[in-house]
C-alpha cells in the first residue's frame, strides 16, 4: 500500500463529505472512511483467516479477516469487495452477499465497515509480502483464540458482530 493514497471521508451513514490521504485517515479517528471485509467460508462452514505479514503497519503477524481493504474513491462497496477478493486471494467470480455495516473505532482511526460473505474452498493466490499465511478455522477454534493476542483487534470486533448476526438469523 502506498502511503499517499487518498480515500473518501464519510459521515456515519456513509455519505461522502470529502477526501483525505491514507496517513491522515489512519491517524485521526474523527475522519471516518469506508472499508470492506469479506468472510470467506468453505463448504464445511469453516472460515478462512489470513495471517498478516510482519511488514504490515497495522496488526503485523496477527490473524485477521479473510479479506479486508479500503473502498476507492467513487467505488461502490460490492465492487470493492470483489476487487479485494481478487487482489488479496486471487478469487474471481465468487458471489458476495452483504451482511451488515458497522463503525469500528480505535485511537488511530474510525472505519465504516461493510461486511460480506462468500463461499470458496480455494485454491488461493496471495502476495507473501502482504499475507504470511491463510487457513480455515472452525468457529470454536476462533472463539478459543479471541483473547490470545494472536488475532487482530479489528477481527475480534468483526467476529463478535458476526456471532450476534448469526444468532439472529
Predicted feature residues:
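Acidic, metal-coordinating catalytic segment for phosphate/diphosphate chemistry
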Residues: 2-37, 41-43
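A residue-level structural signature of the nucleotidyltransferase/glycosyltransferase Rossmann-like core
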Residues: 7, 46-47, 134-135
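Nudix hydrolase/Nudix homology domain
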Residues: 24, 61, 73, 100-102, ...
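A glycine-rich, hydrophobic loop/mini-helix early in the fold
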Residues: 35-67
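A structural signal for short, well-ordered beta-strand segments
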Residues: 38, 67, 98, 114-116
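The catalytic Nudix box helix
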Residues: 48-49, 66-98
